[in-house]
């Protein structure tokens, strides 16, 4: 029985990056032996065990064979006869197919160390093309390691293109796809994730509404980058640089999908793209099974982001309606995320990344001014129900008028 450290822990140590979790592979052992040693079984599909003291995952060395479509279409074989090299060759990328023995010696049968040095993400074997989830995984790794200069090997991109063209991506479950998409959007370069998916044709299969934005022009006076798809990539990059949460990044990815519906004869203007895009955003949320906070914010940002940009021009009554639409008096954080998404949208324009966005402070200040209106005096007057709500709205509107007079340019 031999135990090896494998995968990401080995890769990140060689890159000098912090190691967050460690995976192990066990060669020459059976499931029965693992149980006798006190390991706890957790693998539903193949033998994976938790160490009785550390809780780290130990998997029996295994091989796999394609037996159906999609991520789950594999038959696994684990036995004491499976070698370390046989286990490593089933992995996706050479940089993930390295191991260390208990003395710290590196085992690298597939050139992972060489590819690390060359900053290349390269598949281990042609079996890569059997698992459609690997398209998303490789794009996610590209998003993670782009700041270090990594890129996807041309031949690997070719296999990813084959997978996209084969229709295999349609067999991925929404849950698996969302897990990869959400993790990728939180990487240092989420824009690279989208670009790699587009380069291999997978974006058209997974998020066709976003893919349709590339090549759609916008007015150069407002968008020096012109191309709507390029703008979305820039907005995502701003999200990462400003450490925005997943909900904001998801909303920013989808905020302009309505522009893909504009007839070419109307380009580069996109009248009412906010409302046109809502049905697309709703369909994407449902198809991807986006969690509620992400789905709700995406819909709200899609509908109201131009309100955010015109905040200083909004009438106090319109501003109050906006605050009410966001339920800001009970959910102030959601409105703060909306404001952040608007700012990322404004900064995601080529050459304007550092331009000030006074709308952000103005909107947050307006929300606070309305929130500060006390309810107690109205209750003391005996108001309740609809009467109380109307009186509270009048007081909030009065507060917003005073706020606008003080803070908005005349």
From Swiss-Prot:
Magnesium as UniProt keyword: yes
Residues binding Mg(2+): 21, 23
Annotated HD domain residues: 228-329
Keyword Signal: no
EC number: 2.7.7.72, 3.1.3.-, 3.1.4.-
Reported cofactor(s): Mg(2+); Ni(2+)
PROSITE patterns the UniProt entry points to: HD
SUPFAM superfamilies (UniProt xref): Nucleotidyltransferase (SSF81301), Poly A polymerase C-terminal region-like (SSF81891)
Positions with a binding annotation for CTP: 8, 11, 91, 137, 140
Entry note: cofactor: Magnesium is required for nucleotidyltransferase activity.
Domain topic, free-text comment: Comprises two domains: an N-terminal domain containing the nucleotidyltransferase activity and a C-terminal HD domain associated with both phosphodiesterase and phosphatase activities.
Family from the record: Belongs to the tRNA nucleotidyltransferase/poly(A) polymerase family. Bacterial CCA-adding enzyme type 1 subfamily.
Other observations noted: A single active site specifically recognizes both ATP and CTP and is responsible for their addition.
Name of protein: Multifunctional CCA protein
Provenance organism: Ectopseudomonas mendocina (strain ymp)
Gene: cca
């Amino acid at each position: 029985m031999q135990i090896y450290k494998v995968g990401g822990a080995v890769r990140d140590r060689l890159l000098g990056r912090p190691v967050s979790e460690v995976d192990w592979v066990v060669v020459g052992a059976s499931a029965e032996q693992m149980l006798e040693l006190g390991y706890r079984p957790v693998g539903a599909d193949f033998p994976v065990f938790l160490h009785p003291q550390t809780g780290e995952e130990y998997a029996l060395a295994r091989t796999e064979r394609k037996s159906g479509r999609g991520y789950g279409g594999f038959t696994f074989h684990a036995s004491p006869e499976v070698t370390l090299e046989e286990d490593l060759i089933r992995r996706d990328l050479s940089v993930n197919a390295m191991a260390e023995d208990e003395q710290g010696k590196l085992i690298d049968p597939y050139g992972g160390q060489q590819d690390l040095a060359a900053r290349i993400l390269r598949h281990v074997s042609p079996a890569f093309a059997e698992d459609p989830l690997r398209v998303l995984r490789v794009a996610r790794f590209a998003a993670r390691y782009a700041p270090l200069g990594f890129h996807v090997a041309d031949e690997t991109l070719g296999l990813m293109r084959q997978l996209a063209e084969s229709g295999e991506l349609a067999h991925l479950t929404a849950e698996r796809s969302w897990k990869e998409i959400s993790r990728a959007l939180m990487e240092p370069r989420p824009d690279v994730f989208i670009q790699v998916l587009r380069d291999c044709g997978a974006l058209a299969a997974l998020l066709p509404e976003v893919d349709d934005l590339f090549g759609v022009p916008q007015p150069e006076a407002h968008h020096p980058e012109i191309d709507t798809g390029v703008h979305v990539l820039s907005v995502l990059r701003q999200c990462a640089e400003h450490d925005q949460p997943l909900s904001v990044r998801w909303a920013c990815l989808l905020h302009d999908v309505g522009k893909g519906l504009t007839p070419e004869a109307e380009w580069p203007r996109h009248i009412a793209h906010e409302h046109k895009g809502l049905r697309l955003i709703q369909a994407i949320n449902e198809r991807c099974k986006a969690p509620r906070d992400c789905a709700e914010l995406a819909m709200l940002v899609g509908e109201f982001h131009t309100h955010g940009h015109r905040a200083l021009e909004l009438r106090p009554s319109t501003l109050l309606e906006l605050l009410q639409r966001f339920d800001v008096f009970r959910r102030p954080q959601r409105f703060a995320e909306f404001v952040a998404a608007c700012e990322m949208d404004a900064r995601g324009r080529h050459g304007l990344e550092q331009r000030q966005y006074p709308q952000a402070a103005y909107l947050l200040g307006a929300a606070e001014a309305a929130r500060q209106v006390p309810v107690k005096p109205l209750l003391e007057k005996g108001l309740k129900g609809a009467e109380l709500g109307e009186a509270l709205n009048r007081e909030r509107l009065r507060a917003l008028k005073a706020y606008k007079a003080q803070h908005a340019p005349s």
